[in-house]
Amino acid sequence: MSESLTKVILSVITTNRNRVAGGAPVFFCNDQKEMELFAKNLEAILDGIAHRIGDDVYLIVKHF
C-alpha cells in the first residue's frame, strides 16, 4: 500500500509565543496587522494557503 502526504504545515505565524511550539518554522509578530501581513506574504512566497485558526495564530498549509 502506498501512502502520500496530502497536506503539510509550512509555517506558523503568531502574536502569542505561548500558543505554539516547534515542528514548523514559527514567525512571531508584534500585533494583528503585522501577523496578517506575514500571512499574506508567506502564503504567496511558499505557494500555500493561510488558515486563521484563532485570533492570534495563522498556519500556512500546502495542499497537494
Curated annotation (Swiss-Prot):
InterPro entries assigned to the protein according to its UniProt record, in alphabetical order: YpzH
Protein name, entry field: Uncharacterized protein YpzH
Gene that this sequence comes from: ypzH
